[in-house]
């Protein structure tokens, strides 16, 4: 039965309580896929968002960032083209470390939607108004917008600049062309930003190689150059000047090295097909990384080791590493399910902090990923319950996907 409904509790014709209006339909969740992807579109920097695509949030292009100066702390003359990319969550800075984790997550989604699309026969596609191929097309377009900004952020020596930032905090306003008067600068070149770049761009090679092979090879070449720079500069700290932007401080580099190495290994950058001596011992270093960086429940810009574990679990070059990674991640999935079963809200988090809904969503993503090679109804049900929390089944009675429900 399809339609919009409301549940009422009544006593002798008197309504004592009633639910919100809810809809039963085939394509509610797929519609949310397009809606959540659109949130990245609204974060685009340096381009116009026209009314036919952005609606009431339409705006002219601003913050072109195609000729910006270096921060004085870099002791560097000249200017740099850092056009494009996504704004951060709460300011008009553009950052590699958190942008990289976001784009890496979207690349995983792109990889799995390609597999899912291949599994669907023509009849199932014809009978479903939701187009997975159209979603993937939009997804790849959004991913590429950020990746092209990433490529512009790589210096000639292979290192990657940390962020683009205004010199002071902007007000809570929509960016306009007049904001060009607000001076913006490029800051730092760190080990974390460079390795984050390497991991994300190596993953991009896999996703884009059947879409645009030239762009895919450009991504892989850039990833290798970044990794080699990081080997020569293994502990260059993040820029500590945070005026006008977020710090995103992280002085632990093991997890980023693991992610970058695992992704390069997955892409076949091994001793037998790469001449550069810096890449000939990837497997040996990965074995060390696996001991240093066990998988965790979390996945964010500060803790990226799970992306390394996932890369090893999905690769097929080395079945021994694949088995080790899959077993380790299955333990994580079991821990998530156990913690959720002990929680009144069926969540695996134990603190509600800024961005904790992202932790909930990442737990669900982790369960769905691991379910692809270790199928378990408990993983699927737990992940669905976490999505229910995001979609409105929570103590504050609010859907956390803005613009998607009566209260969001």
What does each of the following model-derived ranges do?
Residues 1:
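Aromatic sugar-binding surface patches on proteins
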Residues 22-26:
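Interdomain boundary/hinge segments at the C-termini of tandem beta-sandwich modules
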Residues 4-19, 29-408:
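Glycan-recognition and catalytic cores of secretory/periplasmic carbohydrate-active enzymes
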């Amino acid at each position: 039965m399809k339609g919009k409904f409301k549940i009422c509790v009544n006593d002798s014709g008197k309504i004592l309580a009633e639910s919100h209006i809810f809809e039963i339909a085939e394509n509610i969740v797929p519609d949310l896929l397009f809606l959540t992807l659109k949130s990245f579109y609204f974060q685009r920097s340096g381009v116009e968002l026209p009314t036919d695509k952005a609606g009431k949030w339409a705006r002219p292009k601003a913050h072109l960032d195609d000729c910006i100066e270096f921060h004085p702390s870099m002791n560097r003359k000249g200017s740099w083209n850092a056009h494009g990319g996504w704004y951060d969550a709460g300011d008009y800075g553009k950052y590699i470390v958190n942008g990289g984790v976001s784009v890496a997550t979207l690349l995983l989604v792109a990889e799995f939607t390609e597999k899912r699309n291949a599994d669907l026969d023509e009849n199932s596609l014809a009978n479903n108004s939701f187009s997975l191929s159209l979603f993937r097309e939009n997804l790849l377009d959004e991913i590429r917008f950020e990746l092209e900004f990433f490529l512009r952020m790589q210096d000639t020596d292979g290192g990657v600049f940390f962020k683009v930032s205004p010199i002071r905090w902007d007000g809570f306003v929509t960016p306009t062309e007049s904001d060009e008067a607000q001076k913006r600068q490029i800051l730092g070149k760190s080990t974390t930003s460079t390795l984050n770049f390497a991991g994300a761009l190596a993953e991009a090679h896999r996703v884009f190689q059947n879409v645009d092979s030239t762009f895919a090879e450009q991504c892989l070449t850039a990833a290798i150059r970044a990794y080699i720079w990081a080997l020569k500069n293994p502990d260059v700290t993040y820029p500590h000047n945070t005026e006008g932007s977020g710090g995103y401080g992280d002085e632990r580099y093991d997890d980023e090295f693991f992610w970058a190495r695992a992704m390069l290994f997955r892409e076949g950058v091994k001793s037998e097909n790469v001449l550069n001596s810096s890449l000939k011992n990837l497997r040996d270093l990965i074995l060390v990384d696996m001991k240093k960086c066990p998988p965790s429940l979390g996945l964010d810009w500060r803790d990226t080791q799970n992306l390394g574990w996932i890369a090893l679990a999905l690769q097929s070059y080395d079945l021994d590493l694949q088995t080790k990674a899959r077993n380790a991640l299955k333990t994580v999935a079991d821990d998530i399910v156990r913690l959720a079963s002990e929680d009144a809200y069926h969540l695996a988090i134990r603190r509600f902090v800024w961005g904790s809904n992202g932790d909930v969503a990442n737990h669900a993503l982790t369960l769905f990923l691991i379910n692809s090679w270790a199928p378990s109804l408990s993983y699927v049900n737990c992940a669905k319950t976490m999505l229910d929390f995001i979609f409105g089944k929570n103590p504050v009675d609010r859907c956390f996907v803005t613009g998607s429900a009566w209260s969001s």
